UniProtKB/Swiss-Prot annotation:
Protein name (record): Retrovirus-related Pol polyprotein
Cross-referenced InterPro entries: Integrase-like_N, Integrase_cat-core, Integrase_Zn-bd_dom_N, RNaseH_sf
Species this protein is from: Gallus gallus (Chicken)
Domain of life the protein comes from: Eukaryota
Gene name in the database record: POL
GO molecular function, one term: RNA stem-loop binding
Domain Integrase catalytic: from-to ranges: 202-246
Keyword annotations from UniProtKB, A to Z: Endonuclease, Hydrolase, Metal-binding, Nuclease, Nucleotidyltransferase, RNA-directed DNA polymerase, Transferase, Zinc, Zinc-finger
Length: 246
């Protein structure tokens, strides 16, 4: 977030936050760290960089350059700035395009490029019960972006490895319902008979078959792990405390 955490934040701390945000964005969008980082010129005369800057540059393997002004600013000087209004705050007469622009999912159903006419950008609240044109269109955009656009990679992965629904959901970080749809659409997986649900073995007499599992109970710290053992015949339960689960 760009919101300062204090009323008077040192500029060095703000610079470190900017560096951290730039490196995080580079990893997320390009899969690699920054190649070059430009720092203010007076840092070059310092024997050691401030702790905030060093922390933001931890693990950085690129080049550090010191300059009073970035070279890109020299290229921006001859550019002509257009004062023609391109984005307005109210709807316009023309086509209406809905897109999923959620920052949490990173999905996009529609991308607009090379725009020449003015456009109005509106935010439609999700999960709104108010009926209307914008609510209906936004719901359709979310539905298509959440299912049809996402399942291309998952379908390719399943057609190669034939992963099950649970493994496909964990590998691709998709909902279980979407993973089941991908598996059910595979003709090879549906040709074989489905396995029935498993049944835990049960003893026919006490002390015959036991089942043990670990469960975490934070209130019992420092020995917060419980080894719960059940006699499958008599249903007697025995629980013992442990410091670790192994």
């Amino acid at each position: 977030s760009a919101q300062p955490v204090r009323a008077f934040t040192p500029w060095v701390e703000l610079l470190s936050l900017l560096l951290s945000k730039a490196r995080t964005s580079a990893f997320r969008d390009f899969g690699k760290d920054l190649d070059i980082v430009h720092l203010p010129r007076f840092f070059r005369d310092s024997q050691i960089l401030p702790d905030e800057i060093l922390l933001a540059l931890h693990g950085f393997g690129g080049k550090l350059r010191y300059a009073g002004s970035l070279p890109i600013f020299e290229l921006a000087r001859p550019l002509r700035v257009s004062l023609r209004l391109r984005v307005v705050a109210s709807p316009l007469d023309g086509p209406t395009v809905f897109t999923d622009a959620s920052s949490s999912t990173g999905q996009g159903a529609v991308v607009l490029t090379a725009r020449t006419a003015p456009a109005a950008v509106l935010h439609v609240r999700s999960h709104s019960d108010v009926p209307g044109f914008f609510t209906t269109g936004n719901a359709l955009a979310d539905q298509h972006a959440g299912h049809k656009v996402l399942t291309v990679r998952e379908a390719d992965l399943h057609s190669t490895l034939h992963l099950g629904a649970r493994a496909l959901s964990r590998t691709c970080s998709i909902p279980m319902a979407v993973a089941r749809e991908v598996v059910q659409a595979c003709p090879h997986c549906n040709s074989a008979p489905a396995l029935s649900a498993g049944v835990n073995p049960r003893g026919i007499a006490p002390l015959d078959v036991w089942q043990t599992d670990f469960t975490l109970e934070p209130r019992l710290a420092p020995r917060s792990w419980l080894a719960v053992t059940v006699d499958t015949a008599s249903t007697v339960i025995v629980a013992t405390q442990h410091g670790r689960a192994n």
